[in-house]
Amino acid sequence: MTEISTHYSYLYNILKDIASDNELSPLLLFKGGTSLMFFHDLPRFSVDLDFTLIDKEREQFVYDRLLNLAIKYGKIVDNNLGFFGPKIVLSYGRGSWNLKIEVSNRYWGEKADTLTLDGFSLNVMSLSDMYAHKLIALEERTGVATRDIFDIWFFEEKKVSPNEEIIRKRKERSLLEQLTVDISILERFPNNRILSSLAPLLTSDSVKWARTHLLSETISSLQRRVSSERVNQRFKKGTSITPPKGNKGLKR
């Protein structure tokens, strides 16, 4: 088995174990790149399992349960119940990727879709909420993660609208303001670094495309969304869009 197929099998089996735990599963919202890969056909590989904890009072229980679950699959090389929630890092073999399970205890009222894979079901964060968090992640990470750029492009390709309410709760700014921040970050990002850490997660054809198109297409997509958002705001305020003077119609 290749490294990707081996890692995929570990991700799959751990998710199946979580789904079969009737006490653990309802407390978790599956999110992030791996959820997009499993349930929404994200065209890149993702190596970690990310969740949001719905009930912070059950944090210790969730941490202990995940630790007992993960230890069946290999060696725990790092684990802690940190300020922002549980983290467990699993190593299952020499030369392989580590598998990180991370649970955020910051619940912002995100919506969930119950989605089914091969007979087991998980609560998966809505695409709209995930996209809002992804726009914020681009800004908040220490250094730009190129997988965030790829995922933003993916959300735009699927015509997902980010949930502005999440952005307002987390950043106290509008969607338009967040988009402006992100475009500025992307415009400063050097294109020759676009494949940094991203290339191993893509097919060879996708690597060729990403090298020349990913950054520019992502910027263009966000710029289009900014234009659309400005029009939406004008209509919300009751401002009509009038044609220029002297353009009252075609003369025959």
Predicted regions mapped to residue ranges:
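Glycine-rich beta-strand-to-loop/alpha-helix junction loops that act as flexible
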Residues: F30-T34
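Structured mid-to-C-terminal alpha-helical surface segments
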Residues: M1-L28, F39-L42, L53-R252
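Conserved donor-binding loop and adjoining core beta-sheet/short helix segment
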Residues: F45
